[in-house]
Amino acid sequence: MKPAILPKLMLGLSLAAMTTAAHATDDAFEVWLNPSIEYDLSKHDSIELETAQRFRSASDGRADTYFVWAWLHHDLNETFTLSGALEQRENDGGFDEVRMIQQLSSKHGFIRTRVRLEERWVEDQSRMGFRIRPRLGVVVPINDSGDWSFRTDAELFLTVRSTSKGGQDGLTGLRTQFGVAHDVNDKLSLSLTYLRQQDFHDNAPDRVGHAPLIGVSYTF
């Protein structure tokens, strides 16, 4: 990638979040954790158990949420990885959710892309929902050894079919994040990221969460 392209791309990701400032928002502070373990089945295949915990304030209607994903990854080549997962989401107060996920991710120099498809079943909702989540990001090494890196990305939530009749479709969310990651060794990676999650609402203020995201990943 030419050096001049990188600042422009990073500026574009930042502007994606800034353009939402004109909308009325309901903001709150949250804490997100994202530990995971992965095991290599072969040179090109691996399984991963990923979890996430989102701690929020119940007083403003934001329940704590707990996730677990069972992933199967297959490296198609050095650029593309195809993945599938089953996800279980538990919300304090109900409306738990099960998702089937298909995902294609890629690496192009500094550029990272990901497209995720989700089939969603939400407790007490009338039908299966379908959502597309495209993500564009940048990963830049910040030391000579390459074990420290800066990363940023922006992800859209495109709801093709809501989980209930009359539910909101179209662009329903935007997630942006930036932070640093450190490869402690060949097996252990740590990351600390600022994450901003904005859920768009047609007839109400957009709901925005601001969270430090702490990631821990271990590979066997």
Model-derived segments and spans:
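Transmembrane beta-strands of outer-membrane beta-barrel proteins
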Residues: 32-38, 46-52, 69-73, 81-87, ...
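Outer-membrane beta-barrel transmembrane domain signature
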Residues: 74, 109-110, 116-202, 218-220
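Bacterial N-terminal signal peptides that target proteins for export
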Residues: 1-10
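Outer-envelope beta-barrel architecture signal
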Residues: 27, 43-47, 78-80, 109-115, ...
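Surface-exposed strand-loop-strand hairpins of Gram-negative outer-membrane beta-barrel proteins
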Residues: 49, 53-65
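Outer-membrane beta-barrel domain signature
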Residues: 23-26, 56-61, 89-95, 122-127, ...
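Residues that define the transmembrane beta-barrel architecture of outer-membrane proteins
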Residues: 29-31, 64-66, 96-100, 126-132, ...
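N-terminal signal peptide c-region/cleavage motif recognized by signal peptidases
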Residues: 19-21
